[in-house]
Amino acid sequence: MLAWPIGLLIWANGKIDHIDALSGAADTPGTTYLLAGSDSREGGVIEDPETQGARTDTIMVLHVPESGPTALISLPRDAYVEIPGQGGSKLNAAFSWGGAPLLVQTVEQLTGLTVDHYVEVGFGGIEQLVDAVGGVELCSDLTVDDADSGMVWTPGCREVGGVDALAFARMRKADPAGDIGRAERQQQLIAALSGKVENPALVLKPGQQTALLSAGTGALTVSEGTGILDLGSLALAFRNAKGEGGITGTPPIVDLDYRPGNVGSTVRLDPDQTPGFFAAIAAGTWPAGPTGGMPGG
């Protein structure tokens, strides 16, 4: 019995793609994961004209301090930030211009946290992951019929397969909260997936284990030195962040339609509060619970 899970982990570890993503900056206390959801809009998926080619539609910082609550912070992809060597632009432009390394540098500059592990999930792999666990339950109060993402929804909760889960995670334009609402749905989807993966019944289903690991590792690209055990630690940290003693949300936001120049509509983070917010996240002194969100919320 012991040989099966050990062999499965070794097999899965060998299937994960690795890239040179980390900056080599001096370590900061605690452990910081940068999670990015990349979306090439290929394979017959309805295309959003604002996201030609590969983009990061999901950018999250997961920080485990030396003491204090674990924090999962969604960084709006349209947040207006300074990108090293490029100037001010939308956060996800860093990935377009310089891939994972420039995204890591940009997030480190914004947050003051050194990224220890970079984990990129191909959005196409989300569909396979959801199907591999037999579907997930998702909830939304919105009425949606969105051609760009493919999301069709009536208010309430329901069990969905991979195609609908992917549309749920992608939809932005039909949500009054825009990028912020999408970030909340993406966190909900990841939590639902994590709950299914942690189900003890999965241990008794070797075939489903193999399908899940195959889908998961096939969808992942991680930084050099990040292995399957680090991903296990990430999953535990994510669960802690989503629990009662964790922190979830966004940095402080002051404007959802900030137009600083030739980059269109962006999200403006609060320039006065954001540095202190991330300093408190790093130190483990920010209070547990939801944080950030819509201006005035």
How does the language model describe each region?
Residues 1-297:
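Non-catalytic, solvent-exposed segments at the cell envelope interface
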